């Protein structure tokens, strides 16, 4: 046992040694100890507790593990300072939270800027359609920019843009299912969604009419070809029936009778609303024209006309109510598949009008 210890040389006296040879000596030492039934450790490999750090470094370096003590020191340091670790983790979490908040604010700012840009583009298009140009010396405030833009109308235009996108999606869906195989239950769900989509448009128009009834009446939110067929802020229900009838499958005698009665009722209601509008126009004209020539003050006439304009909002709502009831009655008269074909025909009709408007607008820009 003593002879085994003489093979080891204290590390301080040897700088570099052969690892293979050293491992061989370790193996012989352990074998001899185990064969004698004892496990004596040579005195020179027992490291005193008070040995300096540089001795450990030199010994580990000689065994090819110079970086290990530094790693152990870091682990010991972190284990001795848990509060410091928690503070650093808390700082990192706070920095990440602030970064997310800055990113969210930046995205919101971009979205706000995008909406403002869309609003300005719509206002410019509306100004061009009305024939107002800044170059002609008209004040920019009269063009309806954000300083004087009615927020209710701006919201309506945004909603209507989304409404048209959703309508186009529903038209594509109806076209696909009608050319494929679908049961009546699923088809009924699509038809009801399309009906509700039109009812949502009537609700939007009612809110917009309260904000600016002249805007709704003028149809500035529609394309030029659609405005050509405008009647009290929308389509005539009787014209709707003319568009739909050729696209239905063979109707029964009872269905034909119901459709004819509905068409007659629509025309009577349209005539009544048209006469009421004409009477209102005459009343407004009389109110505005009243007063002495050269009076200079129009306040009494304007106030009198303002009181009568509330009736104009009622006319818009009544016209949309007639459109709503016409769609609802057609839905009751027709089968589910016939109603789906009718809604597809109606949607494609408005798509063609919008396409006609775009073609007409680009025609003027083409070189001659």
Swiss-Prot record:
Region (Leucine-zipper): 110-124
Domain of life of the native organism: Eukaryota
GO terms, biological process: defense response to bacterium; DNA-templated transcription
UniProt-listed InterPro entries: bZIP, bZIP_sf, TGA_domain
Coiled-coil region: 83-131, 261-281
Domain bZIP: 82-145
UniProt cross-references to SMART domains, sorted A to Z: BRLZ
GO MF assignments: DNA-binding transcription factor activity; sequence-specific DNA binding; transcription cis-regulatory region binding
Region named Disordered: 53-83
Subcellular location: Nucleus
Function: Transcriptional activator that binds specifically to the DNA sequence 5'-TGACG-3'. Recognizes ocs elements like the as-1 motif of the cauliflower mosaic virus 35S promoter. Binding to the as-1-like cis elements mediate auxin- and salicylic acid-inducible transcription. May be involved in the induction of the systemic acquired resistance (SAR) via its interaction with NPR1. Could also bind to the Hex-motif (5'-TGACGTGG-3') another cis-acting element found in plant histone promoters.
Protein name: Transcription factor TGA1
Organism field: Arabidopsis thaliana
